[in-house]
Amino acid sequence: GMGIGINLPPCIKNGEYCNPWTGSIILGGACCGTCTDYECH
């Protein structure tokens, strides 16, 4: 890798809570799939 120095958190698994406006309750987190109805799918 390029070694920029930014470690992104792992993606949020399906079935776990997510916020469609911020992506998730974990800063920088994102669903492995898509976030709909406040749940990762």
From Swiss-Prot:
Keyword Disulfide bond: yes
Example of a GO MF term: toxin activity
The protein, known as: Augerpeptide hhe6.1
Disulfide bond residue pairs: 11-32, 18-35, 31-40
The keyword Thylakoid is annotated on this UniProt entry: no
UniProt organism field: Hastula hectica
Subcellular location, record wording: Secreted
Recorded GO CC terms: extracellular region
Keywords tagged on the record: Disulfide bond, Knottin, Secreted, Toxin
Tissue specificity remark: Expressed by the venom duct.
Free-text note regarding domains: The presence of a 'disulfide through disulfide knot' structurally defines this protein as a knottin. The cysteine framework is VI/VII (C-C-CC-C-C).
